[in-house]
Amino acid sequence: MLNIFSLICICLNSALHSSSFFFAKLPEAYAFFNPIVDFMPVIPVLFFLLALVWQAAVSFR
């Protein structure tokens, strides 16, 4: 249980600290990475949901 709590704290902490970068603009040479960069803050949430579904599949052992 402690591991799940620490994972949630890490995800929330990184999301709060990276919120200032949401409005940053990439240099012109890397403009084609914009869709990937926009999606990157969501990735920790997807890992959390994957862990939740996995635990539900094994009946929260």
UniProtKB/Swiss-Prot annotation:
Its biological purpose: One of the components of the core complex of photosystem II (PSII). PSII is a light-driven water:plastoquinone oxidoreductase that uses light energy to abstract electrons from H(2)O, generating O(2) and a proton gradient subsequently used for ATP formation. It consists of a core antenna complex that captures photons, and an electron transfer chain that converts photonic excitation into a charge separation.
Keywords, in A-Z order: Chloroplast, Membrane, Photosynthesis, Photosystem II, Plastid, Reaction center, Thylakoid, Transmembrane, Transmembrane helix
Location within or outside the cell: Plastid, Chloroplast thylakoid membrane
Name of the protein described by the UniProt record: Photosystem II reaction center protein K
Entry similarity comment: Belongs to the PsbK family.
Residue ranges the record assigns to the propeptide: 1-24
Topological relation to the membrane, as annotated: Single-pass membrane protein
Major subcellular location class: plastid
Subunit structure: PSII is composed of 1 copy each of membrane proteins PsbA, PsbB, PsbC, PsbD, PsbE, PsbF, PsbH, PsbI, PsbJ, PsbK, PsbL, PsbM, PsbT, PsbX, PsbY, PsbZ, Psb30/Ycf12, at least 3 peripheral proteins of the oxygen-evolving complex and a large number of cofactors. It forms dimeric complexes.
GO cellular component, one term: photosystem II reaction center
Annotated TM spans: 32-52
Organism: Drimys granadensis
One GO BP annotation of this record: photosynthesis
A Pfam family assignment: PsbK
This protein's encoding gene: psbK
HAMAP family from the UniProt entry: PSII_PsbK (MF_00441)
